[in-house]
């Protein structure tokens, strides 16, 4: 099979028939063998009924229906598990992503040998409340991930080589960082294509506003930390703990030495415990010890994890 199209959706009953007809037309013109996998993420409208109706007349339509809303990452993960095409295309169901982009995305994967190609909506028809946070988010994501050629990490329109989606795990809210996940899994040839962005035709945006924006940054930091130190927590916690303990120890030695010098010169010196520096030093030593032990426990967990030797292998003979 040439192409699997994975479409996560939530309350998109009006756009589903039109979107499928558009995809089908593009596939037939280019004579691709294909499947369309709709993942209904707990919709409360008749989205699932529309998918079932389409499947009755089209054996290329497959559906997955969640009992409740789990989020886009969960929907993509299940769609990826079911996909069988040589190239996997993801797109949103709101008709803002154009299926006419599929042939060129397919060509870039198959002929130019990209592992992943992400769409770039250079001209957007979204409100400022969405476009401004998106630009700030993408600038940060480029810096943290090291993928400097991508301008739109969260674009729903992407193309993947099949082995990419079978070797990454999309969870939580990590759908925004699939290129970063792919890079960490060893798929480094990542490209970008400027794609046409259309104004929403039906319904309203499901964008979560500033809350989603800040959550995105927290997810990015979590992913970066896990990538850098997930298998070696002692390197970061042990270092920070040792540094804090050392600074606290030096400070408390200075406090004690100051007291001894005053006594040796016959001067009356206040009690060591009367000095605020004593308590500050003691606090730093305690925190340093706790950080060190956190790193030690993290190292024990990492070394005894079932995934500690989970390595991505390109070829074997």
What are these regions (language model features)?
Residues 2-4, 35:
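Cell-envelope/extracellular polymer assembly enzymes that use nucleotide-activated donors
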Residues 12-15, 43, 72, 98:
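Donor nucleotide-sugar binding loop of glycosyltransferases
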Residues 12-27:
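Short, well-formed alpha-helical segments that are part of the catalytic scaffolds
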Residues 32-43, 64-65:
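Short beta-strand/loop segment that forms part of the nucleotide-sugar
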């Amino acid at each position: 099979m040439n192409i699997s199209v994975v479409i996560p959706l939530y309350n998109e009953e009006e756009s589903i028939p039109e979107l499928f007809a558009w995809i089908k037309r593009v596939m037939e013109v280019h004579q691709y063998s294909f499947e369309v996998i709709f993942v209904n993420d707990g919709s409360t409208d008749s989205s699932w009924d529309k998918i079932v109706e389409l499947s009755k007349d089209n054996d290329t339509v497959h559906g997955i229906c969640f009992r409740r809303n789990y989020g886009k990452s969960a929907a993509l993960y299940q769609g990826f598990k079911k996909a069988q095409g040589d190239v996997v295309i993801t797109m949103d169901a709101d008709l803002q992503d154009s299926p006419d982009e599929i042939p060129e995305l397919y060509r870039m994967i198959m002929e130019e040998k990209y592992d992943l190609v992400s769409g770039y909506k250079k001209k957007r028809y979204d409100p400022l409340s969405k476009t401004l946070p998106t630009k700030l988010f993408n600038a940060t994501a480029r810096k943290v991930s090291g993928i400097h050629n991508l301008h739109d990490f969260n674009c729903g329109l992407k193309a993947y080589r099949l082995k990419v989606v079978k070797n990454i795990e999309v969870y939580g809210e990590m759908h925004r960082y699939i290129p970063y996940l792919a890079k960490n899994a060893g798929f480094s040839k990542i490209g970008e294509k400027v794609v046409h962005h259309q104004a929403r035709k039906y319904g309203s945006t499901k964008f979560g506003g500033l809350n989603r924006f800040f959550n995105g940054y927290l997810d990015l930091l979590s992913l970066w930390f896990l990538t850098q130190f997930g298998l070696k927590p002692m390197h970061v916690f042990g270092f920070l703990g040792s540094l804090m303990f050392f600074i606290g120890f030096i400070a408390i030695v200075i406090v004690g030495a100051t007291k001894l010098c005053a006594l040796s010169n016959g001067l009356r010196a206040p009690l060591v415990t009367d000095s605020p520096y004593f308590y500050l030093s003691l606090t730093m030593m305690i925190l340093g010890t706790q950080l060190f032990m956190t790193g030690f426990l993290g190292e024990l967990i990492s070394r005894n994890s079932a995934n500690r030797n989970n390595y991505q292998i390109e070829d074997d003979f």
